[in-house]
């Protein structure tokens, strides 16, 4: 676990031994601060001083920042989903900016569709606000299809939709935040990019929302592979069971108790099982077409060695 504690003349900070989340130290002329994300202190006049290594322990005093334990860079296993979804756009983790990664990720998805003959004939590429937007911009830039915003996010009073503990409230928050631009929806063929497909309930409502507003076709691209496991390290997910995940529900229905043996095949949409999973999710969400970013594509977009990244929610590897 990450740790903060007071110790006499200073505060002591420790980054978790595998560095699953960052700890960033900021500095200005009159002192230091510590945050999960650098943008949190930039408006206060601090600049990034350092990122703690996995397991590193520092003490901040009136005299400066002292390293009490060096940590071990070789144990790095930072959460990949920080770039795909959770991170703020201008946050920088291990030298990689979130917005840059997302744009590059969209470009890779478009390249894959072009290479595999799956680039659809649509009027616009669009992103599910907020985190889906830069993925979509990258896809639009690489594919040559115009980018548009057929619905706008209304943010006052509404939190991020994954935060409420109740699924009904999560759906309500997601629905209330989106306001349609009818001219960009009615009679149009649209390709949307979202950061992920977890349970599928909010996605289903978004697709229905688009059809109700006159969309002719709704294609979807997921900016990461199918979610196969709930996160057991950072407590990000509100899921109480992996059977809440739409991918696991479909696998369980198809394979029963043996389904866990075939997770790797289902995770890869190039395999027969992977294609069946993709097609069934596509059918349930009433999409015209659906493709997932591959794990390899996600890692390429981040630009770090896979051995330094936690990909547990996709492949179950610890």
PLM features per residue range, with description:
Residues 125, 132-139, 143, 147, ...:
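Extended, hydrophobic alpha-helical segments in both membrane/secreted and soluble proteins
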Residues 118-131, 219, 290-293:
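Short glycine-rich phosphate-binding loop at a beta-alpha junction
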Residues 31-45, 59-121, 159, 163-170:
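Active-site-facing substrate-recognition patch
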Residues 65-79, 127-129, 134-135, 141-149:
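Terminal amphipathic helices with adjacent charged low-complexity linkers/tails
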Residues 141-189, 228-240:
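Short, glycine/charge-rich flexible loops or terminal/linker lids adjacent to PRPP-binding catalytic cores
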Residues 7, 17, 27-30, 53-64, ...:
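Short acidic-glycine loop/turn motifs at beta-strand connectors
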Residues 2-13:
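Single conserved hydrophobic/aromatic residue that forms the stacking wall/gate
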Residues 15, 45-51, 205-318:
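PRPP-dependent phosphoribosyltransferase catalytic core
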């Amino acid at each position: 676990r990450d740790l903060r504690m007071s110790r006499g003349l200073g505060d002591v900070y420790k980054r978790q031994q595998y560095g699953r989340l960052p700890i960033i130290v900021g500095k200005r002329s009159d002192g230091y601060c510590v945050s999960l994300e650098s943008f949190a202190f930039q408006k206060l006049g601090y600049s990034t001083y350092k990122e703690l290594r996995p397991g590193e322990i520092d003490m901040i005093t009136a005299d400066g920042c002292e390293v009490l334990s060096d940590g071990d860079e070789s144990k790095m296993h930072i959460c990949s989903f920080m770039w795909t979804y959770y991170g703020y756009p201008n946050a920088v983790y291990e030298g990689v900016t979130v917005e840059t990664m997302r744009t590059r990720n969209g470009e890779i998805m478009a390249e894959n569709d072009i290479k595999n003959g799956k680039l659809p004939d649509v009027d616009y590429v669009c992103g599910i606000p907020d985190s889906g937007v830069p993925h979509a911009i990258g896809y639009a830039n690489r594919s040559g299809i115009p980018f548009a915003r057929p619905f706008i996010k209304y943010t006052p009073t509404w939190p991020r939709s994954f935060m409420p503990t109740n699924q009904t409230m999560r759906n309500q928050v997601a629905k209330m935040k989106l306001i349609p631009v009818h001219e960009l929806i009615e009679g149009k063929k649209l390709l949307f990019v979202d950061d992920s497909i977890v349970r599928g309930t909010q996605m289903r409502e978004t697709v229905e929302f688009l059809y109700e507003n006159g969309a002719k076709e709704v294609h979807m691209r997921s900016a990461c592979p199918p979610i196969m496991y709930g996160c057991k390290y950072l407590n990000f997910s509100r899921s109480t069971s992996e059977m809440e995940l739409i991918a696991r529900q479909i696998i369980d229905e198809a394979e029963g108790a043996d389904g866990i043996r075939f997770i790797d095949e289902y995770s890869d949409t190039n395999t027969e099982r992977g294609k069946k999973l993709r097609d069934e999710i596509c059918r349930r969400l009433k999409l015209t077409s659906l493709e997932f970013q591959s794990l390899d594509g996600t890692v390429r977009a981040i630009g770090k060695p896979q051995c330094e990244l936690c990909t547990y929610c996709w492949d179950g590897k610890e």
